[in-house]
Regions:
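Carbohydrate-active catalytic/glycan-binding domains of CAZyme proteins
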Residues: 1-313
Length: 313
């Protein structure tokens, strides 16, 4: 398992839970042991030392594939640029996707892209993804390669975009593919991190829906081509397929669950690893830095990908 995190002294003007990337291993997918990487504090990927690079302030991993004896890591990073977004002055919010290659999962070499090292640039002024293209997730199908990412448009919320490629290295922006949901819904403020999988003849997108007040749960959308998507109503009271723990419960994932990562099991069921965070009275003032992020696990009800329960419940 590759993940991102940060130490207490990491630049707090970067108001995201990213920083450096690490590796953990497990025999059963339940009990995990962090591995010591070759970089700062045991990381396996860290910000680039060249301040002109797209990934010089922080990095985060969002997808890893094994192909032809190599690990391909699609990651994202932010630069040294400082912006004012809403009530926050933040550094490195101009996220762009990058690629790194490894033989052992510990030692990584960046693949240089055309946009200060990135594979894809942010959109031009006025376009929906002009602020960022973050958390890339890649899928290969009969038509080539698809890269799903999300962005933030302050007046509309979080939006999912798509880029396409013939070789997984050279990418062309396709456009917006998923907008915010209906007013009052669990995804009224948009769709953020996500994973797209092939399931039979369909594409399924498990996405992090954001409410108007910032709470987050997992939703599901379906597509026949990976481009045009239709939301599927979930069984949770808020319309999601897997909801954050009840508000005020004090549980570790009572504020947000997101960044879904699905793994098929031999018995036909699925596991979904996710990042959760707690409620905090300081969130409005401190943003992401007021929250504690951890990794959790949910399991499906057999092959039914619309029914989920937390591991051990």
């Amino acid at each position: 398992m590759w993940y991102y995190g940060r130490d207490p002294d990491f630049d707090r003007q970067i108001n995201l839970p990213t920083g450096r990337c690490g590796l953990a291993t497990s025999r059963d997918g339940i009990a995990w042991q962090a591995q010591t990487g070759p970089l700062t504090m045991g990381a396996v990927l860290e910000p680039h030392p060249d301040e002109k690079r797209f990934d010089s302030s922080h990095v985060g991993v969002s997808d890893v594939h094994e192909r032809d004896g190599l690990y391909w890591m699609w990651y994202f990073g932010g630069s040294q640029i400082t912006q004012t977004i809403g009530p926050y002055t933040v550094r490195g919010f101009d996220l762009r996707p990058g690629l790194a290659i490894s033989r052992d999962g510990l030692h990584w070499s960046r693949v240089e892209g055309p946009y200060r090292g990135a594979l894809l640039d942010v959109g031009a002024p006025g376009e929906f993804d002009m602020l960022m293209c973050g958390w890339p997730q890649v899928l290969q199908d009969a038509t080539g390669w698809k890269m799903y990412y999300h962005t933030l448009e302050p007046r509309r919320g979080f939006l999912v975009g798509l880029a396409v490629s013939e070789d997984g290295l050279n990418w062309t922006r396709h456009g917006l593919v998923l907008e915010p949901g209906a007013a009052g819904g669990f995804d009224e403020q948009g769709a953020a991190t996500r994973q797209v999988i092939r399931h039979g003849s369909d594409y399924l997108m498990f996405y992090e829906g954001v409410t108007k007040s910032g709470y987050r749960s997992i939703g599901l959308a379906r597509s026949t081509d990976g481009v045009h998507w239709v939301r599927e109503p979930g069984r949770e009271p808020d319309g999601s397929i897997f909801a954050h723990a009840p508000r005020g419960s004090g549980r570790w994932d009572a504020f947000a669950i997101g960044t879904p990562s699905l793994v098929p099991m031999d018995d036909g069921s699925w596991r979904m690893y996710y990042i959760g965070s707690n409620e905090s009275n300081q969130h409005a003032a401190g943003g992401e830095m007021a929250l504690r992020h951890r990794i959790g696990l949910a399991v499906s009800d057999g092959p039914d990908l619309t029914r989920w329960r937390r591991w051990g419940e």
